[in-house]
Amino acid sequence: MAASVRILGIDPGSRVTGFGVIDVRGRDHFYVASGCIKTPADAPLADRIAVIVRHIGEVVTVYKPQQAAVEQVFVNVNPASTLMLGQARGAALAALVSHKLPVSEYTALQVKQAVVGKGKAAKEQVQHMVVQMLGLSGTPQPDAADGLAVALTHALRNHGLAAKLNPSGMQVKRGRFQ
């Protein structure tokens, strides 16, 4: 029987940070936990970052993942929102590396392509595919589903058939190696 790997996926946000924990055995994915870390909207940024760091630390301590994956920041129309999101993401990364976890990063496009099959998928499509892929009886909250989708993306890219077919990690794009 294949060894099990536990992966923590994080969808960072300054107000709500979603997380998802899955186990991967061979080509099978199993739901462990998911949830949302909510920060007080009226709290100063430093306090909100402290909440994110503390709660991600608790998730790591309780569920003991061996690997972590975080969604990268996308550039928003509002520069202030992008900066806030970047700071929340930095808090998540700091919490993970302080627990000595290897961290991989994926763009929203990569997550949607891995889970749904197309990069322009709607949040509802991501939620639906997370439910299907993990055999869940209910639909997780959108941010928690995104955290699970990030974990699934990491599993599919590093533990699934794609990793076995391309162990070097090299990607071919339009006939060129990158």
Curated annotation (Swiss-Prot):
Where is this chain's protein located in or outside the cell?
A: Cytoplasm
The active site lies at 11, 71, 143
Taxonomically, which superkingdom? Bacteria
Indicate the enzyme's highest-level EC class. Answer: hydrolase
The free-text note explaining how the cofactor binds reads: Binds 2 Mg(2+) ion per subunit.
**Which SUPFAM superfamilies would you find in this protein's record?**
Ribonuclease H-like
The text of the family note is: Belongs to the RuvC family.
Name of the protein:
Crossover junction endodeoxyribonuclease RuvC
Taxonomic source organism: Neisseria meningitidis serogroup B (strain ATCC BAA-335 / MC58)
